[in-house]
Amino acid sequence: MVKLTSIAAGVAAIAATASATTTLAQSDERVNLVELGVYVSDIRAHLAQYYMFQAAHPTETYPVEVAEAVFNYGDFTTMLTGIAPDQVTRMITGVPWYSSRLKPAISSALSKDGIYTITN
C-alpha cells in the first residue's frame, strides 16, 4: 500500500520541476515591478550615463520612488508599487539604451519569473 505522504511528496516534486507560467497584461503591476526592478538595477550599474541623460533632458523626470529605490540598497520593490503603468513605460522606453540594454534584460527577468505579457 502506498502511503499518502509518498504520493504527496511525488506531486510536490513534479510541481517543483514544472515551470509555472503566467500571462499578464503589460500594464499589470507584477509586470511593472519586474520592469522597474530591472530599471533600478540598470540605473545603479550605469549611474553616470543616467545623470548625463537627465542633464541633457531636464524635463524627463523620475518619480521620487525610483530615486529612493536607486539609493536604497535593501529590498526596494515595495517602494515601487503604485507607479502608473504609463509612467513606467515612459521612463523605461524613454532612454536611448532601451532597445539594446533594458528590453532584453526585462524580457529575461520576466521569463525567469515565468511571466509572459500580452498587449493591452
Curated annotation (Swiss-Prot):
Keywords: Signal. InterPro entries: SRP1_TIP1, Yeast_SRP1/TIP1_CWP. GO terms for biological process: fungal-type cell wall organization. The keyword Signal applies. GO terms for cellular component: fungal-type cell wall. GO terms for molecular function: structural constituent of cell wall. Pfam families: SRP1_TIP1 (PF00660). Residues 1-25 form the signal peptide. PANTHER family: CELL WALL PROTEIN CWP1-RELATED (PTHR31002:SF34), SERIPAUPERIN (PTHR31002). Belongs to the SRP1/TIP1 family. Seripauperin subfamily. This is Seripauperin-13. It comes from Saccharomyces cerevisiae (strain ATCC 204508 / S288c) (Baker's yeast).
